[in-house]
Amino acid sequence: MTFVSARLARTVAAAVLLLAQLDCTSSPEARTGKASATRAPFGVLPSGDSVHVFTLTNARGIEVRAIDYGGIILSLRTPDQAGKFDDIVLGYDDLAGYLKSTPYFGAIVGRYANRIAKGQFTLDGATYHLATNNGPNALHGGITGFDKVLWKAEPTQDSTGVGVAFTYTSRDGVEGYPGTLTVRVTYTLTDRDEFAIAYRATTDKATPLNLSQHTYFNLSGDGAGDVLGHLVTIDADRYTPVDTTLIPTGELASVAGTPFDFRKGVAIGLGIDAAHPQIKAGGGYDHNFVLNRTNDSLVHAARVVDPRSGRTLDVATTQPGVQFYTGNFLDGTLTGKHGHVYSRRNGFCLETQHFPDSPNHPEFPSTILRPGTEFHSRTVYTFGVAPK
């Protein structure tokens, strides 16, 4: 039995009450307003290139700010149960913070999100060697992944909402990957309190591709402390166990009877320090969950509720997996927005994705994109509040 602090026990009790209300989760009352999208300067890169911030606001007042460097989501303001707006994502106040070595706060990650074992794979008889940046492995595209490049950006608006489209071309051989890859990632904020991400990509040579978004959430608000009391539901009967370097073993293991069973809603803190070899391997949760699906349509993947604020987050995706990461490597050395020091487990990520190291696991869903075909996927984050 894992020891649970009195504070966490109280939080879990509140979460249980909210769980009973989750089917009635609703957005805050509509406020009179008009959706808008604006563009403003956000600093200059060492190369001399200018970076811009795009601010998306829906009719209800929810606001997303993102920059064209890394497609990074700077802030995301949503209301709590009392109607008070707070920023619910981790990050920095200025560009300088993101230019340092960071834990991918808010960024688009690729060309291959997550890990590739030993930084190598074989494709069509040729072996490719990638830049390694995570022990022996390649992580999130390598040393200069999509999180560290300037994207071309343009505002968008259609019947669904306001947005910004980011486009980037990754040249053949960059970080060791084959093929010139053109990627378009569109962020859209709707008046239904949805933040949708649409990914598209084409290539001129066969290449592995795995795109994701690496935002760290804290539904109590940025700088509000740990997320151990957040109640998480993940629609997955299985997960992919990992070795000591966080590379999947190839097994699709049942979550039943393990700390990885989030099918009915569990507080993050209940199992995060369990005496389980997989928990020890990740220092908490840093694992891919195999979503329950029968096709590649948009399906519900996860739900998070914060009993302190009443905020809820639902995630739907066309991807086969989601990486649940609990900020285990935040160590108190990073100072973020408004002087907040980010300590262990101060945020969580739900990174929709294909499985880690898929190029080396033919039994996993394929991540190989070939010329003449287009990769496309969609992820939707929906924000709400539980009724009082």
Give, region by region, the residue ranges found by the protein language model.
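Bacterial N-terminal signal peptides that target proteins for export
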Residues: 2-12
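An exposed, glycine/acidic-rich loop-and-rim segment of catalytic or binding clefts
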Residues: 24-62, 67-388
